[in-house]
Amino acid sequence: MLSADDKKIIAQLWEKVAGHQDEFGNEALQRMFVTYPQTKTYFPHFDVHPGSEQVRSHGKKVAAALGNAVKSLDNISQALSELSNLHAYNLRVDPANFKLLSQCFQVVLAVHLGKDYTPEMHAAFDKFLSAVAAVLAEKYR
């Protein structure tokens, strides 16, 4: 559960991300494919090489979904309901992969924001990404 302080910090962090979210989404996916190569199995039709337009496009979608969740911090489940259905029923992605991508997104934020990515931001955004992963996995039950 996100506290009022967490929500405030997450909103402030996303303001810092604004204008870079597509780049960050792309980089997070690239990091995931390199660090966890088994995740490539869910993208058999993608060219997963660095600079791939398909990965760049999907990174934009990831960032847009996170942005949508940030705008709906009081009801992330409703904001991501369609995405949850897609991943559970159509794509059948192992929900463990959501946590892997979350870790990679955290690394991207730390690399790009440096000292501006405070421990408080890290903790709040980690809770947020955990909530997003839980919502995306809730239809699997």
Swiss-Prot record:
Keywords attached to this entry: Heme, Iron, Metal-binding, Oxygen transport, Transport
Subunit structure: Heterotetramer of two alpha-D chains and two beta chains.
GO biological process, one term: hydrogen peroxide catabolic process
Record SUPFAM superfamilies: Globin-like
Entry similarity comment: Belongs to the globin family.
Described function: Involved in oxygen transport from the lung to the various peripheral tissues.
CDD domains, per database record: Hb-alpha-like (cd08927)
GO terms, molecular function: haptoglobin binding; heme binding; iron ion binding; organic acid binding; oxygen binding; oxygen carrier activity; peroxidase activity
UniProt keyword Metal-binding, yes or no: yes
GO-annotated cellular components: blood microparticle; haptoglobin-hemoglobin complex; hemoglobin complex
Domain Globin: 1-141
PROSITE patterns: GLOBIN
Tissue note: Red blood cells.
Naturally occurring in which organism (per UniProt): Anser indicus (Bar-headed goose)
Residues that, per the record, bind heme b: H58, H87
Alphabetical list of Pfam families matching this protein: Globin
Name assigned to this protein: Hemoglobin subunit alpha-D
